Amino acid sequence: SISTFGAAPSMVGYLYQVRLALLWAIRRSRTSDFVVSLETLDDVSFEVGGEPQAVLQAKHSLKTTANLTDLSAELWKTLRVWLVGLASGEIPLGTARFLITTAAAAPGSACGALGIEGRERDVAEAAKRLKHAATSSINGELKPAFEAYLALEETEREALLAHVYVIPSQPDAAEITEQLQSELYHVSLNHQALSVQMLEGWWFKRVLNELVHPEGGIPRAEIDAQISDIQESLKPDALPIDEDLDALMIAL
C-alpha cells in the first residue's frame, strides 16, 4: 500500500516539537531570561549567556496505549543524545534535561523513578534499572546507547540522572492548544482562541525562518513583545470590525 510511505507520525512529531517549544517558552518567560532554539543542542534548548540551562526531547506517539519501559527506544535514543552532549561538553552536567512524552511511564520503571518531584523520584533506582536493561538487552539498534551509558562510572550515571526529568502522559499535539489558551488567558479573556492563533501564526513563521537562516535562537524579549502586541490588538477599542475579524480568522 502507498500508505506505507506516509510520514504522518514524523510530521506530527515536528509540529508537536514546535508547539511544545512555544508553550515552554511562555512558561519560562515568567521567571527567567533565555534564548530558545530548535534542532540545535536538542529538540528544544533554552540558553542564558550562551550556556544551556535546559534541553528538551519531545516524543509524540499516535498510539493511545504507548508506554515507556526500561528498554524503550525513545528513552535510550534520548539518553544517547544527552550522553554524547555530555562527552563533547556541549551539554554540561548541570543542564536540566527533560524527556517530554505523550506516552505513559510504566509502573516501577526507570522513567517512573525520574519524575519531576515526589516520593516516586529515585535517581539511584533509575540508575540501577537502566544498568540492568543495558547489560541484559540484545537490541542491536540500541547497543551504542547501552555502551555509552555503561562506559560511565556508577557515580557518573547517578550524577547525570540527577539532572534528567521524565514528564509522561502529556497532551498530544492537538491538545496542547488548551494549555496555550490557559497560559495566554491574561492576553484577552474574551478572545483566548484567537490570541493563540495569532501567536502561533507568528511563531511558526519565526521558527521556520530561524531554521532556514539561523541567528542564534529566538530571545525571550521577542516573544514577550509579540504577546504584548497581540494583547494590544485585542483590546475592545482596538478590535477590527466584524468583516476584518472574519477575514483575519480565515487567514489564520
Task: Please give the residue ranges for each predicted region.
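Catalytic centers of nucleases
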Residues: 10-11, 15-84
